[in-house]
Amino acid sequence: MKRKNNDIGTKIWNIIENIMDYILRKIFRLKISDKQWNTLTQFVKFGIVGLSNTIISYLIYVIALLIFQKNVWIPSWDYLAAQIIAFVLSVLWSFYWNNKYVFQKGKNAQRSLVKTLLKTYMSYAFTGLFLNSILSFLWVEVLHISKLVAPIINLLISVPLNFVMNKFWAFRDKK
């Protein structure tokens, strides 16, 4: 479903979608229904937003940490304050782009932005804080997997779960 908007994001997305289409339908000769295609492209968009979210979160964290360390506002808790600020602002970033490009409102659908934003924060808090902490404990303490590998394994569970929570709960349209 190509868009006819001329903004840079739409142009980049059309290129990505053409590459996906070529690989899946031409090279692998997969038969994909329109509904499957829409869900797949939505998941890829969600992944792109998530990748940008990770970069934004890290940059905000580092900047906040440097500001706190330079001004010695909260010396022993500086990294926690920086993490909270990074979480709040990066989820807001994700909300904006997910609302604009990934989980767009259907025709004649209604969606409360405030409720959607609160649900977005809750889903990211659940997967990003609660679930990842439990899974990390399981991988590291119970299964003795490296602390460096555990977060990567977490992504295999938390990203699809977060996608489902956002698609069917946070960004669900009222008809």
Give, region by region, the residue ranges found by the protein language model.
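Membrane-water interface of transmembrane alpha-helices
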Residues: W93-F103
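A structural feature that tracks compact, well-ordered secondary-structure segments
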Residues: N98, G128, F137-V140, I153-F171
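Juxtamembrane helix-capping/reentrant segments at transmembrane boundaries
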Residues: K105-Y124
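Transit-peptide-like, low-complexity N-terminal presequences
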Residues: M1-L40, K174-K175
